[in-house]
């Protein structure tokens, strides 16, 4: 029998027959640490040193990207108690440190660390071996995140390896070309649903992160039916605080007293870069309709991102792309909306917390014709 797999826009959440919550405010959209079930993706056009506090004060979890110096990543991870991303080779070096092969490093055996092994292909046995090693050292106190995976059954291997968080979904991010270039893909809603079912069946403790393809608020709520967390890149890039290169220009030309909106390409040609200290001023002008502001956004496998991580690296064929997105909001405004929308979804499903929201009823959409 044909087994159809579903994306986020193939399903809708169904309300309970009768609900007993009197207000959406009775729903608690935060996890046990008081944070939203959302991570900012470790991308160099999303997270930077200067905006970590912006994310955290808005209750968004952060993973520090690999373009920042290794020792500085560790320092920031400790300062803010957040995950920092490492490459496969850096993860191997960390293993050697705990094995006593390195006499001097930025790490200490009496410290705890939150490490994200940031890899596109989380199906490699070599990665699983590294994960087992990192979780087996008696002198290591490591909370470990890794991935990405696009086969539900791989979850069992990461659970057995002692991994704490696994990132699911390959190829569906707006700056990712893996699916279109390689043909590798697993529709995201079905992937996290089937991964969750395996987790539930085996009593797994490794948390599921839906990472990629989140294009709107509705996708977040649908992902959270089965995922513990959602990881977001493109939506956060469209916030004024994001790390992407920021350009601006008047959004129109004045021709004989008439406003003629400028073609997109002229903004990139003639627009000037906005320094971070001018973001607030630029955002006020944007809200007043005086400026158009654009953010560079790129996948971390693009050659530009590879060079930003290591200027001397041998560049690989890119499975990502670079483009510009129009700034649409600031972080606090976006978060205010998401909290309200998530609470509303929880009230429809009579869910007072995120645990109650798990396994909310849903149906397959035969047509997608409501307002996006």
Residue ranges and their predicted role:
Residues 1-207, 234-239:
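Active-site entrance/lid segments in N-terminal catalytic domains of soluble metabolic enzymes
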Residues 1-17, 21, 182-210, 214-372:
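Alpha/beta catalytic cores of nucleotide-metabolism and tRNA/nucleoside-modifying enzymes
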